[in-house]
Amino acid sequence: MASSNVDSSEPRISRESSLKRSLSISKSLKGLFKSGGGNANTGPTTAAAAAAPSSISTPEVPTLATKDKQDRLKNLAANKEKELQTSRRGVASPSLSPTRHVSLSNLAKLSLTSRAGTGQVDPNVIHETSPLASDEESTDLAFGKRQSSSNRSSSFSNEEQEPNNKYPLLEKLMGDLDEMVCGSIDTQLSKSPDTVEASSLRRSRSTQRKRLNSFSLRPRALSNPGQNPNHPVENRERSNTSSIDLLMSHESESRAIYKSDQFSVYPDGHHAHHLKVVPIVHDLEQSLNKPKSSFSFSGFFKTHRTIADDGENLATALSLLPANRFSFHKRLSQIIDEENGNHNADEELEHNGNNGVDSDSDADYDNQSSGNSNPSDDESESDEDGYKGPNKSANVPKIVNEKSVIGANELKLINQLTEKIDNGFCLKGSKSDAVSSNEPSSAPRKQHLCEKYGKSIGIIGQGAYGVVKLCYKFIDPDEPDLKDNTYFHDNKLFYAVKELKPRPDEPPKKFSTRLTSEFVIGLSLSGGNKSRRSSARTHPNILNVIDLMQTPNAFYEVMEFCPSGDLYSLITRSSKSDSVLHPLEADCFMKQLLHGIQYMHAHGVAHCDIKPENLLFLPTGVLKICDFGTSSVFQTAWEKKAHFQTGPAGSEPYVAPEEFIPKQQYDPRLVDCWSCGIIYCVMVLGHYLWKIAIKGKDSVYDAFLEDMEKHGQYYVFDEMKHVSPGMNRYRTAALYHIFQVDPNKRITVDSLLKSSWMKRTKCCVTYPPRPV
């Protein structure tokens, strides 16, 4: 009975449910399409399906009007969905720009190759978020994984036979495009400027970007948002994007195809160094800008020596350089009289050239530090001040090597300084002004160190012979000449002041030789204490030596300040972050080092102590060679041939093997070349090649000798990676020429600079061509 009642009422319930369900679905569809969400091709949503009873399966019967309305709403929803998708992607007209919109966070990962249009990121391309984490990662990221193939080999052989004008930028930058992988750094370096500019302008045709003449990595939709009025910027999804102004501020970073904390490489092949400045400079600025308070607890907790240390000693330091021209000529005349028995001091004074320096006015010291400023004995030459050059009365030998850094003037200065040191003016506690006792009363008063170079603000280094202090002095911005001598920042000149004291067991004669050698050679190489009116005797990679001053207890050498520290600090900072210098960065430093050493060799001086601690840097990456205390003058102005020397000199890891052979003479120029090779390997490897180059005392060096004797190659050199196989091949060949145990087979610095490796190395310092 109960079942019959259910059966009789079931048809009525089904019709009502069907009608309600149809109305519910129609309303749901209307609401769905009005809001623009959902997909027009997918039918009812999950929420609409859940609203209907699951037990009822009677099909819906919509009216004709409902179907027409649904079709119209479907078309509207489809168009709306396409519009939304277009606005989300930020796609402009396909015929104008196929590039897809990329968020700011992924902007630096863009590839400059054809893969950029597909949104794929080449894993071989280095971007700013991928530091050189380790040796293995540096192989994968910095240099790219390259797999050899027959196609690449054949293409290399074909390209090698083609004329160089096909790749004008190739010969200028890297020199070898043969086996370069698409998407790597070397691919970008190989592109000609016309190719890079054309491809960049296709990506961005913005009028503003054309005026800036820059290479855009941004999609067209961002570079010119007003191009397509149908897709305004405000309708785009902004979850992962930023404003155009903020994006333009990151333009320089996005243009770099490689970027680290200290080095960047750009698509046109040039690079930029941005080395950090030592903290003491920033601390000084903060202390000067910070308001002074009457009391501070910080003084109780200082554990290092600060601004006040040794201030009294520096305040009493006086210069050993002559105060004016007259006194200097008078002293040199006395020295000549004593050595040559010439009593015509006044006559000699009239015949001496511009040999002095005005310490107070920073007069030009070029002639004193230049060997080629001395004419021959049978000639007499007047300068602009009316003084004449030396003649036969001086009994000076004829100069045969005008380029030598040690000439007549330098020899006289060495004798003068040596005499003062041997007489014990400073080291025996006599007054500082005793040095000036021979000067006439009309000579101007000498300036103390603090008056001339400012006050000390702290210690920046410490060596075996004393400490190095930093001094600063405010100057007038209208004095441009002084800015060339040393580091200049915020109307302040900074000077490095090196303290020189004899060791407890060091004989005075040895100390005077070391002191005069370091100062006079450095002064002569850097052009002396002058206002840079003539740059004929200056070199960008030689540290400027400015002055030598004295106190009752020590000597102080005033030098140019390099605010970015030395190469040793740069390498250790990279090692702490498990990275090494980029090969292009190391190549640039190597080329600068070789140019500086070449300049020294051309003037008769070998450094003999090349190591990372003696290579300083400016923030722009300019390398400066310093510390000439162990330098060897192998050829003076009166010698036609170079002289060899015996005995080891320098630091053991950088010393050439022939120096350790007892009583064997060696060419100091070839020793410098060996040391330069060690320096380069330390930069790219992050560690020494070996501790000492003596057979039987170092297992690594023994392995090197064994590999070279049996196989003619060393695995360390072969495993080094570069940005291209061509550059890697050129570099490896040069390293084998450097590390020849037999010095007679070793390459010279001049020949190394002419090698394919160095000729294709991009350097941030421009050097004038050497005269033939």
Curated annotation (Swiss-Prot):
The keyword Nucleotidyltransferase does not apply. Residues 9-19, 66-86 have a biased composition (Basic and acidic residues). Keywords: ATP-binding, Kinase, Nucleotide-binding, Serine/threonine-protein kinase, Transferase. ATP binds at I460, G461, Q462, G463, A464, Y465, G466, V467, V468, K498. InterPro entries: Kinase-like_dom_sf, Prot_kinase_dom, Ser/Thr_kinase_AS. It catalyses: L-seryl-[protein] + ATP = O-phospho-L-seryl-[protein] + ADP + H(+); L-threonyl-[protein] + ATP = O-phospho-L-threonyl-[protein] + ADP + H(+). One of its GO terms (cellular component) is cytosol. Pfam families: Pkinase. Residues 202-212 have a biased composition (Basic residues). Residues 454-758 form the Protein kinase domain. The active site is at D609 (proton acceptor). GO terms for biological process: intracellular monoatomic cation homeostasis. Residues 20-33, 41-59, 146-158 have a biased composition (Low complexity). It comes from the Eukaryota. Its EC number is 2.7.11.1. GO terms for molecular function: ATP binding; protein serine kinase activity; protein serine/threonine kinase activity. Belongs to the protein kinase superfamily. CAMK Ser/Thr protein kinase family. NPR/HAL subfamily. HAL5 sub-subfamily. This is Probable serine/threonine-protein kinase HAL5-like. It comes from Kluyveromyces lactis (strain ATCC 8585 / CBS 2359 / DSM 70799 / NBRC 1267 / NRRL Y-1140 / WM37) (Yeast).
